[in-house]
């Protein structure tokens, strides 16, 4: 099963330019991207040789777009997949909007409409957007609702409305400067999608990228509930097949899954929040990682998933780039119980990261603490 997934996660794609980057993101589906450099490193791992300028060009042309969507987390997706994640996210997060903003007079859609209207004419700075909505809620809803905007929960929902795209102030898509927001419908032509239809298509995207997968994996990844996911699987009929895993669990897969790809991509440096972990519900992340080792890659206190090393089809270490003056070094820490990462096998993965991030990596430290 692991090899089936790796073939989809590491497809064979011709070229290393902008169009190849877009094709990769299309194959992978929405990529979780709380860390801005994440998509660049994901491209480096799966399309080694693709450059920083190629990834940036795809962003600049809005061939791939960044928005807060599935499960209220930042994702990068193709322009074609974006309406799907937007539709599903708006539905699944509606109750959170209602509760966090203490809405009584207004419904959620009225508030969202105002967010989109304000961000329609130009790219809005995050602080300006939040202040506008605080004042608007004070006038149209209540003082209590406006006061909720002072807290992180309500303000995060508003600035993270999935109908808004994010972009950096300085063109550096790999840095934490993506504090400009604009309604997606005013950036490119956007046809609204019914959320039930969107969930069907996203289920197909998920199985095509992470399958075979369980119904709980699909529900977790999309942020939707099991009842709706079960209805989708029933609706797909013979477009999906059931498989019985060695663990006795029922898995689902596309009847006609993607072909080709690399069943063993070798050693790769994967980004924070990589799909080999975050593409599955927490109990199912054992496909590529021993669950006893989760605490070595997931820092529960702040919810951060470390960048990880894939070797022989398993996650065996974490890594990070360490700045020392003007130099950048690579620090790798093995996961206890897993094989050590051989220094002589890191050459190509390092070169791929250097090209994708436009950096030069100096020393490699296989013993330095990465936390």
Predicted region positions:
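Long, low-complexity intrinsically disordered regions
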Residues: 1-285, 289-371
């Amino acid at each position: 099963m692991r090899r089936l997934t790796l073939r989809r996660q590491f497809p064979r794609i011709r070229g290393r330019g902008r169009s190849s980057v877009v094709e990769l993101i299309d194959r992978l589906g929405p990529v979780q991207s709380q860390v801005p450099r994440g998509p660049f490193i994901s491209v480096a791992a799966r399309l080694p040789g693709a450059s920083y300028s190629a990834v940036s060009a795809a962003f600049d042309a809005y061939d791939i777009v960044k928005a807060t969507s599935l499960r209220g987390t930042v994702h990068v997706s193709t322009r074609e997949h974006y309406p799907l994640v937007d539709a599903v996210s708006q539905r699944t997060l509606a109750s959170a909007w209602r509760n966090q903003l203490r809405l009584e007079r207004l419904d959620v859609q009225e508030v969202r409409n105002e967010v989109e209207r304000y961000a329609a004419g130009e790219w809005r700075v995050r602080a300006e957007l939040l202040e506008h909505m605080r004042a608007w809620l004070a006038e149209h809803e209540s003082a209590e609702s406006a006061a909720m905007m002072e807290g992180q929960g309500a303000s995060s929902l508003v600035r993270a409305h999935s109908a808004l795209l994010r972009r950096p102030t300085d063109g550096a898509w790999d840095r934490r400067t993506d504090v400009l927001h604009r309604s997606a419908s005013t950036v490119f032509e956007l046809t609204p999608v019914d959320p039930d239809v969107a969930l069907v298509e996203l289920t197909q995207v998920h199985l095509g990228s992470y399958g075979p997968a369980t119904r709980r994996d699909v529900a977790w990844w999309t942020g939707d509930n099991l009842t709706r996911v079960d209805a989708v699987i029933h609706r797909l009929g013979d477009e999906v097949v059931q498989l019985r895993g060695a663990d006795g669990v029922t898995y689902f897969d596309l009847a006609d899954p993607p072909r080709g790809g690399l069943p063993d991509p070798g050693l790769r440096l994967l980004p924070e929040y990589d799909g080999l972990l975050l593409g599955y519900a927490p109990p199912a992340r054992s496909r590529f990682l021993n669950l006893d080792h989760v605490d070595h890659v997931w820092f529960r206190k702040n919810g951060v998933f470390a960048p990880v090393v894939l070797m022989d089809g398993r996650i065996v270490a974490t890594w990070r780039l360490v700045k020392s003056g003007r130099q950048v070094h690579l620090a790798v820490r093995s996961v206890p119980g897993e094989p050590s990462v051989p220094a002589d096998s890191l050459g190509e993965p390092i070169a791929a990261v250097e090209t994708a991030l436009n950096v030069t990596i100096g020393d490699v430290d296989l013993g330095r603490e990465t936390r």
